[in-house]
A protein has these predicted regions:
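A short, structured beta-strand/loop element
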Residues: 15-50
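A structural detector for beta-sheet-dominated domains
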Residues: 9, 19-21, 57
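Negatively charged, low-complexity tracts enriched in Asp/Glu with abundant Ser/Thr
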Residues: 1-13
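Mixed-charge, Lys/Arg-enriched low-complexity segments
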Residues: 52-87
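Generic detector of low-complexity/intrinsically disordered segments
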Residues: 6, 22, 80-81
Length: 87
């Protein structure tokens, strides 16, 4: 199973794909979330080496960590403040 959830442009040739996936070991099915960089290869995009796969149960903690990183980036002036982003 693979369900593409989002595609985020990274550059003119690359994109980040976020998907729900699963893989099976001997007797266990593991539900995963994947964020992987895909690169343009002719008319298609192919998966690159860069990315992350984590158990779907870790998704809330990962989101919390990314939100903390966003807050820190805004506080450091690396991203516009929420007020500026809304305008």
């Amino acid at each position: 199973m693979e369900k593409l959830v989002a595609t985020i442009p990274k550059s003119a040739r690359d994109e980040i794909r976020v998907a729900l996936t699963e893989f099976t070991t001997k007797d266990t099915v593991h539900q995963m979330v994947s964020a992987r960089v895909f690169f343009e290869d002719g008319p298609e995009h192919r998966p690159g080496r860069n990315g992350i796969n984590v158990k779907v149960t870790l998704l809330p903690a990962l989101i919390e960590a990314l939100q903390a990183a966003e807050r820190e980036a805004r506080a450091a002036g690396l991203l516009p403040s929420q007020d500026q982003a809304a305008a």
